[in-house]
């Protein structure tokens, strides 16, 4: 808890940060972004991003 949160939450947030960066800075598909950022599937990325950040991958990408 060095970062004030359990390790799994810290890692999830790091993966989401990386996924958001890929969505904004690349033209990778949502499935590719999910795989590259450590999510098991596109739907896992979408549900986690929606639950924790309140945005879908498409909305993140449109915010370029």
Model-assigned labels for residue ranges:
Residues 1-40, 62-64:
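Terminal helix-turn-helix DNA-binding modules in bacterial transcription factors
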Residues 47-64:
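…primarily DNA-binding HTH/wHTH and HhH modules…
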Residues 43:
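Key DNA-contact positions within bacterial/archaeal DNA-binding proteins
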């Amino acid at each position: 808890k060095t970062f004030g949160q359990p390790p799994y939450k810290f890692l999830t947030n790091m993966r989401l940060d990386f996924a958001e960066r890929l969505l904004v800075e690349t033209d990778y598909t949502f499935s590719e972004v999910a795989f590259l950022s450590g999510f098991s599937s596109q739907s896992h990325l979408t549900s986690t991003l929606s639950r924790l950040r309140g945005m879908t991958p498409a909305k993140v990408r449109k915010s370029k």
